[in-house]
Amino acid sequence: MSVHAIQHPLVKHKLGLMREAGISTKSFRELASEVAKLLTYEATQDLETQKTEIPGWSGEMLEVELLKGKKVTVVPILRAGLGMLDGVTDLIPSARVSVVGLYRNEETLEPVPYFEKFVGDLDERLAIVIDPMLATGGSMVATLDMLKARGCPLVKVIVLVAAPEGIARVQEAYPDVEIYTASIDERLDENGYIVPGLGDAGDKIFGTR
C-alpha cells in the first residue's frame, strides 16, 4: 500500500485554515470541498485513457484521449464524507455515487453499519472512498470489506487527515489500497480522535456542533 501525504502549498494552506478553533460552518464546508478536489487531482493521475475520434469544431474528425471503461464510483462514508463529495465530482462529473452509512460505537470505537447503496458493475470500476478523517481505521476497513466482497478490483482512499493508527489498520487489512491525505497527524487521543486533527468534521460540516 502507498500512502501519499500531499505537500502542495494550497493543500497545506487550506488545511491549516480548517484547524482554526472558531472556524464557521460555511468556511469549514467550503475548505473541505476544496481540499478534496485537490486530493482527487493527485489520486486520479493514473486513470486509464483510450484514444477516441470525435467531430471537431472545424468539421474534421479529431483523435482525443478520454477515460476508459466504466470509470469511477465515489463512495462517501456517511455522514461526513458528503462534505467532500462535491469537490470530487467537480473533477469527475460522470462518476457514479455509492453510499455507505456507518457510525462509531463510542464505547468500543468500532463501526456499526446502518446503510449501504452501491452502483452496478463494481467489478469494472475504480472506487474512491472519501471521509474527512482516517482515525482508528475501523469505518474505512468496514467499507473496504463491503467493496471487496462485491468484486471491486481497485480502491483508493481520500481523507483530509489521517492518524498513523488508522493507516496501519488499513495497511494490514488491504495492502493494495492507496491512501491520499492532506496530512498524517501525530496520534489518536484516548477517545479515538486525531491529534491535532480537525475536531468532529461531521459536526463542523453540517453545523451540528
UniProtKB/Swiss-Prot annotation:
* Reaction(s) catalysed (UniProt annotation): UMP + diphosphate = 5-phospho-alpha-D-ribose 1-diphosphate + uracil
Note how its activity is modulated.
Allosterically activated by GTP.
Q: What is its EC number?
A: 2.4.2.9
Q: Which InterPro entries match?
A: PRibTrfase_dom, PRTase-like, Upp_B, UPRTase/APRTase, Ura_phspho_trans
**Cofactor, how bound (note):** Binds 1 Mg(2+) ion per subunit. The magnesium is bound as Mg-PRPP.
Q: Which residues bind 5-phospho-alpha-D-ribose 1-diphosphate?
A: R79, R104, D131, P132, M133, L134, A135, T136, G137, G138, S139, D200
Enzyme kind, highest EC tier: transferase
Ordered alphabetically, the record's keywords are: Allosteric enzyme, Glycosyltransferase, GTP-binding, Magnesium, Nucleotide-binding, Transferase
In which pathway is this protein known to take part?
Pyrimidine metabolism; UMP biosynthesis via salvage pathway; UMP from uracil: step 1/1
Tell me where on the tree of life, at the top rank, the source sits: Bacteria
From which residue to which does the signal peptide run? Answer: none
Q: Which molecular-function annotations from GO does this UniProt entry contain?
A: GTP binding; magnesium ion binding; uracil phosphoribosyltransferase activity
Q: Which cofactor does it need?
A: Mg(2+)
Keyword field contains Nucleus: no
Q: Which family does it belong to?
A: Belongs to the UPRTase family.
Instruction: Outline what the protein does.
Output: Catalyzes the conversion of uracil and 5-phospho-alpha-D-ribose 1-diphosphate (PRPP) to UMP and diphosphate.
What is this protein called in UniProt?
Uracil phosphoribosyltransferase
- Organism the protein comes from: Chromohalobacter salexigens (strain ATCC BAA-138 / DSM 3043 / CIP 106854 / NCIMB 13768 / 1H11)
